[in-house]
């Protein structure tokens, strides 16, 4: 997930006719905590119209500022400075994650995030 956009959604849209009748799901990975309201917002923004019925799963990932492009690093640093000025009690989950990772790396990966997707896969076997 990058700025509420899920990488690869365009591939689904472009190939939706080829995928008709096949089981497919979306696993989105991002830095934000698994907040149900945020996840639902991302799902609705990305899986619209004929993609709305595709199952959507979320897993929290990792953050490494050094692996980002110069433009992304610069944008994230500016955003972190802006968010740091806010009242901590008013921060959204993604803003808290942004500050938590400030200036370096963070790894929030956990195999448990994959369990809902794995259950969905096993149901179709």
Label the predicted regions:
Residues 3-125:
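FMN-binding flavodoxin-like domain, especially the glycine-rich phosphate-binding loop
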């Amino acid at each position: 997930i990058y700025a509420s956009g899920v990488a690869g959604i365009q591939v689904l849209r472009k190939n939706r006719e080829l995928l008709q009748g096949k089981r497919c799901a979306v696993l989105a990975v991002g830095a934000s905590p698994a907040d149900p309201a945020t996840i639902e917002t991302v799902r609705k923004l990305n899986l619209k119209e004929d993609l709305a019925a595709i199952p959507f799963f979320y897993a929290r990932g990792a953050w490494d500022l050094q692996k980002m492009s110069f433009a992304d690093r610069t944008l994230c640093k500016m955003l972190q400075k802006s968010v740091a000025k806010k009242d901590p009690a008013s921060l959204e989950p993604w803003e808290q994650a942004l500050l938590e990772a400030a200036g370096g790396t963070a790894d929030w990966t956990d195999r448990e995030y994959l369990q809902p997707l794995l259950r969905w896969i096993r149901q179709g076997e």
